[in-house]
UniProtKB/Swiss-Prot annotation:
Protein's name in the database: UvrABC system protein C
Domain called UVR: residue spans: 217-252
NCBIfam families: uvrC
Native organism: Anaplasma marginale (strain St. Maries)
InterPro entries in alphabetical order: GIY-YIG_endonuc (IPR000305), GIY-YIG_endonuc_sf (IPR035901), GIY-YIG_UvrC_Cho (IPR047296), Hlx-hairpin-Hlx_DNA-bd_motif (IPR003583), RuvA_2-like (IPR010994), UVR_dom (IPR001943), UVR_dom_sf (IPR036876), UvrABC_protein_C (IPR050066)
GO cellular component assignments: cytoplasm; excinuclease repair complex
Pfam families recorded: GIY-YIG (PF01541), HHH_5 (PF14520), UVR (PF02151), UvrC_RNaseH (PF22920), UvrC_RNaseH_dom (PF08459)
Signal peptide: none
Length: 613
């Protein structure tokens, strides 16, 4: 019997009585929704079932439950059941109750920030920007929603380079009496100062519209024909404009994964589950172009089948779905989801099973991606047994849900960085990683650096407090950590390599003076080594990145005639020092403030390692 089950033994008997009472009031073979209530009527969980009686019986068998489900069931004092006319009605009611009640143990996957759109605003000179929010009348033309925010950013950047569309606010646009630096960098045609007519600007907007509606091939042919026509007429300057637009279109195609012959907007959604965890992979097409894919994870063993998880996902996440969504589930359940969505939305969405070769291909791709993503996530996860063993080893009252790992990196005190890596039962939580640029320690004192990092982390107000802290360090780090963590009551340990600094000889130092050694091949030791190594990797990467930025900037500092303003203009124009190094002389001379002569000097210095006289 697990530690958790022992602690909850009395509560589980109360929960079993609540389940039994609910079962006695439910007829057989009916669909519906059930609410698990805790103390003071607090709603803990909302679920739905095609067969309510069969579903509730599953809460009798405590031996088959995960620790997460046991913890939830252990707080049940009452079950409230609502019988519905159909499974579709149950699915819709479940989604509405979850949205309204926000139960503690339900997985709510909705992104309150909304998915990003590409917006061409309603204006005589429309601007192109990334937009999040509801589509409203008078806003302009929205393209999307798209899954990948990064790809949207890259596509907008490429479209601006291709068609010189503005991105500034209307207030900034109205206040200009001369072009800004975006015009100098050829990202904008400066309509604010009428450098382009409204008619010509509208043509550029129309070309961007073609790209965003999947008509890139048609546009490419038009641009190529125009380029050849200008070239035949010896108008090489105009031909170069169309050449640059063709190159920008190619860069957009590099951003997207692949294209399809389908002209409609569609998503392909596949699900894969293992060990009580599910991954839903969404591949999104807009105008026949794929703008990326996104995995969604659900850690919830309450669901009876993958189809149930899929139904929950559709109603919680899809606030604005495309016209077609292809899923890999039974066609009967597609009808259930369709019926629920029709009542939820004001427009029709088709939930379909794949039939054509192309549809099946993209669903298989989504399925394979879901399998890879879930297997990768499960490899990173800590098994409950490992966390229970960690709690027992270091005297924690419960298995830790949040572990923070700290490490420093520097070379002789230069470019010092401290880092925080976060992990728990769900694996490595990379979005919560943090870097600390050391500010007060100048002599490479590792103990003082660790003190600064911990002090800065725990001096701030944070809703996330770790259950356990692991420090990559030895006995000497104990005093630095006690000064910060001692009064807070946060348990910690320092993990040091052995005398020969070999893996497998690690030692744990505790604040009470104890020293612990583990079996080098034990699962707990392998887990501790994995999270320690992740912190070490992150620290080294942060240090190297800082060092490389400094060294790269120093390269331009030594070129006569290149001061801070020109250095900044070069890096802004080309995106990085590497971009400057790859540039030709004629490209460098296009940067505002860089003459042909200075461009030649910069090019020669970067290529040969010396400035020309």
């Amino acid at each position: 019997m697990s530690v958790l089950k022992k602690n909850l033994a009395g509560r589980l008997l109360i929960a079993r009585d609540a389940v039994k009472k609910a079962l006695n009031s439910i007829p057989c073979d009916v669909a519906g929704v059930y609410k698990m209530l805790g103390a003071n009527g607090l709603v803990l969980y909302v679920g739905k079932a095609k067969d309510l009686k069969k579903r509730l019986r599953s809460y009798y068998n405590f031996n088959q439950m995960s620790d997460r489900i046991l913890a939830m069931v252990g707080h049940i004092t009452e079950l409230d059941v609502i019988v519905t006319q159909s499974e579709a009605e149950a699915l819709l009611l479940e989604a509405q109750l979850i949205k309204t009640l926000k139960p503690k143990y339900n997985i709510i996957m909705r992104d309150d920030k909304f998915y990003p759109y590409i917006l061409l605003s309603k204006h005589e000179y429309p601007r192109i920007v990334k937009y999040r929010g509801r589509k409203e009348a008078g806003l302009g033309k929205c393209y999307g929603p798209f899954i990948s925010s990064l790809v949207v950013k890259l596509v907008i950047s490429a479209l601006r380079k291709a068609f010189q569309l503005r991105s500034c606010s209307d207030n900034f646009f109205a206040s200009r009496d001369r072009p800004c630096i975006e015009y100098e960098m050829r990202n904008c045609s400066a309509p604010c100062t009428r450098k382009i007519s409204e008619e010509d600007y509208a043509k550029s907007v129309h070309m961007a519209h073609k790209v965003l509606t999947g008509k890139s091939k048609e546009l490419q042919r038009e641009l190529f024909d125009s380029m050849r026509k200008f070239s035949d007429n010896l108008d090489y300057e105009s031909a170069m404009v169309y050449r640059d637009r063709l190159q920008a279109l190619k860069s957009i195609q590099e951003c997207v994964s692949f294209q399809t012959e389908m002209s409609c907007d569609a998503d392909f959604v596949s699900i894969y589950g293992r060990s009580g965890t599910y991954c839903l992979q969404v591949i999104s097409f807009r105008g026949g172009i794929s703008y990326g894919s996104q995995p969604y994870f659900v850690d919830d063993g309450n669901y009876e089948s993958e189809s149930d998880v899929l139904g929950m996902f559709m109603l919680q996440v899809y606030s604005d779905p495309p016209g077609r969504v292809y899923v890999d589930c039974e066609s009967d359940y597609c009808e259930v989801i369709n019926a629920a969505l029709e009542r939820l939305l004001t427009r029709k969405v088709d939930i379909l099973t794949a039939k054509s070769h192309e549809e099946l291909k993209f669903l298989r791709l989504a399925r394979n991606s879901a399998m890879e993503a879930l297997n990768r996530r499960l490899r990173d996860k800590a098994l409950p047994a490992e966390l229970e063993e960690l709690a027992e080893l270091f005297g924690l009252p419960n298995p830790p849900e949040r572990i923070e790992v700290y490490d420093n990196s520097h070379i002789s005190g230069t470019h010092p960085f401290g880092v925080m890596v976060v992990c728990g039962k769900d694996g490595l939580l990379r979005k919560e990683y943090r870097k600390f640029k050391i500010q007060t320690v100048l002599n490479g004192d590792d103990y003082s650096m660790m003190h600064e990092v911990l002090f800065r982390r725990f001096s701030e107000e944070s809703p996330s407090v770790p259950d356990f802290v692991l420090i990559d360090g030895g006995r000497g780090h104990i005093s630095s950590a006690i000064q910060v963590l001692g009064d807070l009551g946060i348990p910690f340990a320092c993990m040091a390599k052995g005398s020969n600094r070999n893996a497998g000889e690690e030692v744990f130092y505790l604040p009470d003076g104890r020293k612990i050694c583990l079996d080098p091949d034990s699962k707990l030791m392998l887990y501790m080594r994995k999270i320690r190594d992740e912190a070490h990797r992150f620290a080294i990467t942060s240090h190297r990145s800082s060092r490389d930025r400094t060294l790269s900037s120093a390269v331009l500092c030594d070129i006569p005639g290149v001061g801070s303003a020109r250095r900044r203009a070069l890096i802004t124009y080309f995106g990085s020092i590497d971009g400057v190094k790859r540039a030709r002389t004629d490209e460098i001379s296009k940067v505002p403030g860089i003459s042909i002569k200075l461009a030649q000097r910069i090019y020669a210095y970067l290529k040969q390692g010396m400035a020309q006289p």
